[in-house]
């Protein structure tokens, strides 16, 4: 899952040994190579460095420290570094085997989490979509005028507010994300779970989906029973908020944070821009911007240097490493 601290000076995680380790020329050369190969290739290259004869103990330690990239913050990775400090080749081999198991377990756990969230997302999407379609049909069937004439004024009001509700939610999300979710202590109490590593398929921040769904339910219920243009407009606004929430879940949770697979849509140019724009939000590099979701790239265009960085990160984006 792509989570980064709120405060940070870079959009990408730091790659390098701890500051107290001296960076020798050999270690620096090795680290530069690591940035251009996959995690699996990193591990193979580093394992060769560790077991290669005539390599100084310090280089072995640096190599083992770099292995923490593959399984950060795990007991196995910490044990690997401790084994390197002992300078024992056998201990290093054992630690590498432990790291292999840690990587396999981590991948299996992530797969289970993705399947759990995907099942919940599919069930919610099908259920909400079915209810919305059926409720729309019932509303206009109930309020048709005598003789069966279609109330075109109400239909137009509903369609306009569907679009308006969705666009309005993007503006509201930009405001709420900054003022409520980050700057408000109560909002941050839930939202901070989204900016820290997650250990399960769900996080406290997911409660905002329910909270933001309440206005949509109220508007749809009120507009469903009110037989005039105002009722049609309220019904449409509720549908627009619902549509925005479903799209937000697909793009934010699925595409950006990889909580479930999204298929080939991830390769679309604008979807890549949405991804790296939200990545910059998690980095905190531009004061937390962008705060919006679907217009995040446009929000960054007003910040000096941000638009150029978005284009650079789009070119560097590699889904196989995420």
Swiss-Prot record:
It is a multi-pass membrane protein. A motif (Histidine box-2) lies at residues 191-195. The histidine box domains may contain the active site and/or be involved in iron binding. This is Beta-carotene 3-hydroxylase, chloroplastic. Residues 164-286 form the Fatty acid hydroxylase domain. GO terms for biological process: carotene metabolic process; xanthophyll biosynthetic process. Nonheme diiron monooxygenase involved in the biosynthesis of astaxanthin. Hydroxylates beta-ring of beta-carotene and catalyzes the conversion of canthaxanthin to astaxanthin. Uses ferredoxin as an electron donor. The lineage of its organism: Eukaryota, Viridiplantae, Chlorophyta, core chlorophytes, Chlorophyceae. It comes from the Eukaryota. It is found in: Plastid, Chloroplast membrane. The chain crosses the membrane at residues 118-138, 149-169, 207-227, 231-251.
């Amino acid at each position: 899952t792509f989570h980064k601290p709120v405060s940070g000076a870079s959009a990408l995680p730091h790659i390098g040994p701890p500051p107290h380790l001296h960076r020798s020329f050999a270690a620096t050369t090795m680290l530069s190579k690591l940035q251009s190969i996959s995690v699996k290739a990193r591990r193979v290259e580093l394992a060769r460095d560790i077991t290669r004869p005539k390599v100084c103990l310090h280089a072995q330690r640096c190599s083992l420290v770099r292995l923490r990239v593959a399984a950060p913050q795990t007991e196995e990775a910490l044990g690997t570094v401790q084994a390197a400090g002992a300078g024992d080749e056998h201990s290093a081999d054992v630690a590498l085997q432990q790291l292999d198991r840690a990587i396999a377990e981590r991948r299996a756990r992530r797969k289970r989490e993705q399947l759990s969230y995907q099942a919940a997302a599919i069930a919610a999407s099908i259920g909400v979509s079915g209810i919305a379609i059926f409720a729309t049909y019932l509303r206009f069937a109930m309020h048709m005028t005598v003789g069966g004439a279609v109330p075109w004024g109400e239909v137009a009001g509903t369609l306009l507010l569907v679009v308006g509700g969705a666009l309005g939610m993007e503006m509201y999300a930009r405001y709420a994300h900054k003022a409520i979710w980050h700057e408000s202590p109560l909002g941050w109490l839930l939202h901070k779970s989204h900016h820290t590593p997650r250990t399960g398929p769900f996080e406290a921040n997911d409660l905002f989906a329910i909270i933001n769904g309440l206005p949509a339910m109220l508007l749809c219920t009120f507009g469903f029973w009110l037989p005039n243009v105002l009722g049609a407009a309220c019904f449409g606004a509720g549908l627009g908020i619902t549509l925005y929430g479903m799209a937000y879940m697909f793009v934010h949770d699925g595409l950006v944070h990889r909580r479930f697979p999204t298929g080939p849509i991830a390769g679309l140019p604008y979807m890549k821009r949405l991804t790296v724009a939200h990545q910059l939000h998690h980095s905190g590099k531009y004061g937390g911007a962008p705060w919006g979701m679907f217009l995040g790239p446009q929000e960054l265009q007003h910040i000096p240097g941000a638009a150029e960085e978005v284009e650079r990160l789009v070119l560097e984006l590699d889904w196989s490493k995420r």
